[in-house]
Design a protein with these regions (language model features):
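Short loop/turn elements that form and flank the Walker-type P-loop nucleotide-binding site
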Residues: 60-63, 100-101, 131, 150, ...
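Peripheral, non-AAA+ core regions of ATP-driven protein-machinery
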Residues: 1-217, 221-224, 328, 463-464, ...
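Basic, amphipathic alpha-helical bundle interface domains used for macromolecular binding and assembly
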Residues: 38-46, 61, 68-78, 286-287, ...
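Conserved alpha-helical scaffold flanking the Walker A/P-loop in AAA+ ATPase domains
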Residues: 207, 261-262, 267, 278-300
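Walker A/P-loop
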Residues: 218-257
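Walker B catalytic acidic pair
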Residues: 297, 303-304, 315
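Clamp-loader machinery-focused feature within the broader ASCE/P-loop NTPase space
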Residues: 243, 247-280
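Residues immediately C-terminal
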Residues: 112, 300-301, 307-308, 394
């Protein structure tokens, strides 16, 4: 047989389109050519494949070898096609059984010794390949990642020789099994909310944000506990569901670091304020996920919010509304999920001490206005909760009584989320405008109070709907079916800090 077909997958954002690797051997001067819009890394695989085949004890055919990666208009990158190319050549030259090739999809980079090295996007490939009905053969390091997908068989191999022995029926590979962790990793120590003294309003806002999935902005002088509170938010969020786990791990598998710990911790990303737009939303010639996508189903914490470049902050507007980000480059486009919970912290002025009870502010009114203008109105309009975090007095700091623990708050948050999922199948922050009208259940008195405050404060329609979502969360935390006037007034109070 001089022609062989092997299945593999490329990466395009979270998608993994099917690639058919065709290997053809013909008489003529020995030559090895790869066609089908391969990247530089793929072209370099010729030398890796030749050395790996020889080092694995096989004969490299002294013929004219043509490898086609179809479809030709799909860009191909990285060394993931090394293994399928090598198997195609071995099958076309009659050194392995070609009949079993159609049952599997292959991916893996080859070392010169024939050993297999891990590749990016193993879980994303398995996620996309479930409907094809084929099994996967991957490097051992990638197999545990891909095996979390239910309903698909994944086999891990350490070398080209092991894969060939499996296909020839000499020594079958063992199917890889991976059990989904049901609890957050004990190795990751999430700080406890009991460490925070005082700040009852901020603690309540944090609980509301956790219960309804709302975004939160905290403003206050340096050292008042804004960052401390934010770092404790993951500790009062319920563990990831199984579907959420798969999405989070699929995104992690796209990173260059292939060895990712598989746990059910919600992501917590805290990029530095010098981060670029590409670092925040993703990008590059081969688009990779950015911080907002790596925070998918978790928390994105932006400390010193006005210090971020305004262009970087403005790119948050689309994902805050839609829960995904579209990246367009000259030759490639990618869509990544970005359903994150935004938590931000900032000082009230450049020096940080505006309104401080003992330290005077050194800023002019112009510098304060310029400082706050770095955060645009449309972005602020998309933040559900905005609170002030005041400095504590000496007596409050010296008190020995610990605050309420994260475990106690988590119980209330879990109960509120259970109500929301039972009523609408999602958290309140994700309710659309049409869903909000049917699910909010606002009392007539509360509607009248809300309408009066909207006119008085000149709030936008977006603010109106976000206030309704927060009020619905307050009612869920209280275990009440209807939103009353108290819930509405509290929700309005959480939007008046700026």
């Amino acid at each position: 047989m001089s022609l062989a077909l092997v299945y593999s997958r490329a990466l395009s954002g979270m998608n993994a389109p099917l690639v058919e690797v065709e290997a053809h051997l013909a008489n003529g001067l020995p030559h090895f050519n790869i066609v089908g819009l391969p990247d530089t890394e793929v072209k370099e695989s010729r030398d890796r494949v030749r050395a790996a085949i020889i080092q694995s004890g096989f004969d490299f055919p002294a013929k004219k070898i043509t490898v086609n990666l179809a479809p030709a208009d799909l860009p191909k990158e990285s060394g993931r096609f090394d293994l399928p190319i090598a198997l195609g050549i071995l099958a076309a030259s009659g050194q392995i059984n070609p009949e079993k090739l159609a049952q599997y999809e292959f991916a893996g980079e080859l070392a010169l010794s024939g050993l297999l090295r891990p590749v990016r996007g193993a879980l994303a490939m398995a996620w996309q390949g479930m409907q094809a009905g084929r099994s996967f053969v991957l490097p051992q390091e990638n197999a545990e990642q891909a095996a979390v997908m239910r309903g698909i068989a994944v086999y891990g191999a350490r070398s080209l020789g092991e894969v060939a022995a499996h296909l020839n029926g000499i020594e079958p590979l063992t199917q890889t099994e991976c059990k989904l962790p049901r609890r957050p990793s004990e190795q990751s120590k999430i700080p406890d909310l009991a460490d925070v003294k005082g700040q009852h309003t901020a603690r309540l806002a944090l609980e509301i944000a956790a219960a309804g999935g709302h975004s939160l902005l905290m403003m206050g002088p340096p050292g008042t506990g804004k960052s401390m509170l934010s770092q404790r938010l993951p500790g009062i969020l319920p563990p990831l569901t199984e579907d959420e786990l798969v999405e989070v791990w699929a995104l992690r598998s796209l990173l260059p670091n292939h060895q990712q710990q598989l746990d059910s911790n919600r992501p917590f990303r805290s990029p530095h304020h010098s981060a670029s737009s590409a670092a925040m939303v993703g990008g590059g010639s081969d688009p990779r996920p950015g911080e907002i996508s790596l925070a998918h189903h978790g928390v994105l914490f932006l400390d010193e919010l006005p210090e971020f470049d305004r262009k970087v902050l403005e790119v948050l507007r689309e994902p805050l509304e839609n829960g995904e980000i579209h990246i367009s480059r000259a030759a490639r486009q990618a869509v990544y999920p970005a359903k994150f919970q935004l938590v931000a912290a900032m000082n009230p002025c450049p020096c940080g001490y505006l309104g401080h009870p003992s330290k005077p502010c050194r800023c002019t009114s112009e510098s304060i206005a310029r400082y706050r203008s770095k955060i645009s109105g449309p972005l602020l309009d998309r933040i559900d909760l905005t609170i002030e975090v005041p400095s504590l007095s000496a007596a409050e700091l010296m008190q020995q009584e610990a605050g309420e623990s994260s475990a106690a708050v988590l119980e209330r948050v879990t109960a509120a989320r259970k109500i929301q999922y039972g009523r609408q199948g999602k958290v309140n922050a994700e309710l659309s405008v049409s869903e909000l009208d049917g699910k909010a259940r606002i009392q007539k008195e509360a509607q009248e109070a809300l309408g009066a405050m909207l006119e008085k404060l000149s709030l936008s329609a977006r603010s109106f709907h976000r206030i309704m979502r927060v009020a619905r969360t307050l009612a869920d935390l209280a275990g009440e079916e209807e939103v009353n006037k108290t819930h509405v007034m509290k929700a309005i109070g959480f939007r008046r800090a700026l």
